[in-house]
Amino acid sequence: MLILGVSCFYHDSAAALLDNDNIVAAAQEERFTRVKHDASFPFNAIKFVLSEKNIQISQLDAIVFYEKPFLKFERLLETYIAFAPNGFKSFCLSIPLWIKEKLFQKKNLFDKLQILDPNFKDLTKIKFSEHHLSHAASSFFTSPYNNSLILTLDGVGEWATTTVGIGKDNKIDIKKEIHFPHSLGLLYSAFTYYLGFKVNSGEYKVMGLAPYGEPKYSKLILDHLIDLKIDGSFRLNMKYFDFATGFKMTNKNFEKLFQSKVRISESDNLEQFHMDLAASIQDVTETIVLKIAQNIKDEFQIDNLCLSGGVALNCVANGKILKKKIFKNIWIQPASGDAGGALGAALAYLYNEKNFTRRINLDFMKGSYLGPSFSDAQIENILKIEKIKYKNIKDENFYDYISELLEMGMAIGWFQGKMEFGPRALGNRSIIADPRSENMQKKLNLKVKFRESFRPFAPSVLREDVNRYFELDCDSPYMLLVADIKNEIKVKDNNPNTLFGIEKLNQKRSIIPAVTHVDYSARIQTVHKETNEKFYKLLQAFKKRTGCSVLINTSFNVRGEPIVCDPKDAIKCFLGTNLDILVMNKFIIHKTNQDSSLLLDYKNKYELD
């Protein structure tokens, strides 16, 4: 059975193709269009996933959209009625688009699919999943568990913002829901907006900023903005929010509560107030997630937990669940946001609707390496066309040569194999560097990534060595768990109370300072030989040369740009930044060997997110 899953028209459009219970391919549209968080119909992603099986739309058994547009339209109308006359202007502006996109969605999808394949005639093949079921399916059906609780947390789907389900064998049963406008994801996004970052894009910046502050406003949030019950259920006080009726997340009451106006631009100074506010909403989020997790464990007595939805990308909160040992096992879908809804929609149809027999696969996600790959011949041809000078190193010396460059302090663009599906670079479209360097975080943030100095970098570590460096002794292949640095590798702080806010940034905290956040934590990727042999071998070579089995791993892009997809993207990013080396498959490109006329001004190419 060939099933295409599709998500689009909100943010992070994507497509995924299943051949029975095998993920053939999956990719986000942004990687092809180079428009970050592209919400448009995923023409390019669909063409790619179908090409991996060499089939056309008309050969598919089903095309499954990730949510139900009629239910979403119902929510939009009922919300307007509930809050009327507030929001009349936004309602009038939005209703024509809602009618087109929600009431005639099936025809809209059919027309777009026919552009890709004029022979596609069967409208009945187009199916619809529910938004939170798609999220839940993307997590449970890719997990190694026969029986698990499933917690989905995001902004909003049709009505649900939080759902608790039970996955057993090939079925998912939703047990509990919290409905719009009461949403943990939207609460976090409201603070993202208030702090001057982009909604549905900058939430991870709030999480990264939080350790620079103190949670001074947690009580204020819990007293005024959200009514949190003992079981983790909650209600927002809509007096302070405009997202249900307007185009803004917060209103004047919100500003009055915190005695400060919205930070309008990301170029405005970040003050201690902003850092304390980030720390506070992160603290409240962790409190709520932990309460929900503990309550559902107590109620259902199931030892496994699957996490999905945009809030599941909050790796700090995920790490707290792990640290509290509420569950024996935790699985997090690497594409937890709406992009992963494409995969989940296809899986929900396969199992829940078609009753396909489920086989447990310990690597169902294939490391999340589900995107395009390029042969040596393809890459070499592009290098010649672009007039790029390159060298080949013999296989037996390849990894040692790259590790030597890393030891010399080089920042390297690492382009190998299949592109990752989801927001994280996991060693195939990565920028890598030596984590032992005290200056590397500043170099990468300011000269390579062109992003804020407070942003932390993640470590990739050999799986067998993870507990040498971190308070973690389990798999974290998708960079979705945060854990503390081991005490043994910390550098003693002789003045623990003298530095505040951004002053903490330049203090050396461990023997791997470039991946140690200011609170002595790290967002960890464990690297496994079975899923990424090349990256594993590079870490082995670096360990052999330096004694350190950790590398900085950050996504191969600049701020505001999607992760690079093809060799041309990689070359442009390399030539437009202060990357020293580009490695694509076996080809090694040194910046100093290139004609200066090829260098690009990349800093202003993308709108900063």
Residue ranges of predicted features:
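Flexible beta->alpha loop and helix N-cap segments adjacent to enzyme active/binding sites
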Residues: S7-A25, T33-K36, T79-S90, L97, ...
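Hydrophobic or amphipathic alpha-helical targeting/insertion segments
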Residues: I55-K89
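Phosphate/ATP-binding catalytic cores across multiple sugar-kinase/actin-like superfamilies
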Residues: A279-L305
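Short HxH-centered metal-ligating active-site micro-motif
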Residues: N44-E52, I63-E67, L538, T546-C548
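Feature for intrinsically disordered/low-complexity regulatory segments and propeptides
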Residues: K100-L103
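N-terminal phosphate-binding loop and adjacent alpha-helix
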Residues: E29-I55, V289
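Extreme N-terminal starter segment of soluble prokaryotic enzymes
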Residues: M1-L4
